[in-house]
């Protein structure tokens, strides 16, 4: 029997067209915005996203407010519903939930990176 969180994760991922780490460079080249939602302590212990992959750091607890183009707390990149948000966490679990939340806001191109930061760092290694 699957746990409740596994069921929620499955539902979240059903909303997404998840991005393999190897496809991140192409996504960035077409204008996608990579968002690292890992907490500061996790970024410090695991490492920052390589400079080859410019990423905005937006911690999970404020993600929706920063990416919602109708929010007073939005970031400059939140120009509309057509932005391709690519959410990155450590291993690709929290990012799936976060990207699904962005989809729920109407940001229909939101997705996440399969395998998270651990997969992405292998692309540049």
Residue positions per predicted region:
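Rhodanese-like catalytic fold shared by cysteine-dependent sulfurtransferases
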Residues: 1-33, 40-85, 91-125
């Amino acid at each position: 029997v699957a746990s409740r969180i596994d069921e929620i994760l499955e539902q979240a991922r059903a909303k997404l067209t998840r991005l393999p780490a190897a496809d991140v460079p192409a996504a960035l080249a077409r204008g996608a915005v990579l968002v690292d939602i890992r907490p500061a302590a996790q970024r410090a212990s695991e490492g920052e996203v390589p400079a080859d992959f410019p990423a905005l750091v937006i911690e999970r607890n404020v993600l929706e407010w920063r990416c919602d183009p109708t929010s007073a707390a939005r970031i400059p990149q939140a120009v509309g519903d057509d932005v391709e948000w690519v959410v990155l966490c450590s291993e690709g679990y929290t990012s799936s939930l976060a990207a699904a939340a962005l989809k729920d806001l109407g940001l229909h191109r939101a997705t996440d990176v399969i395998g998270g930061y651990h997969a992405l760092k292998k692309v540049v290694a």
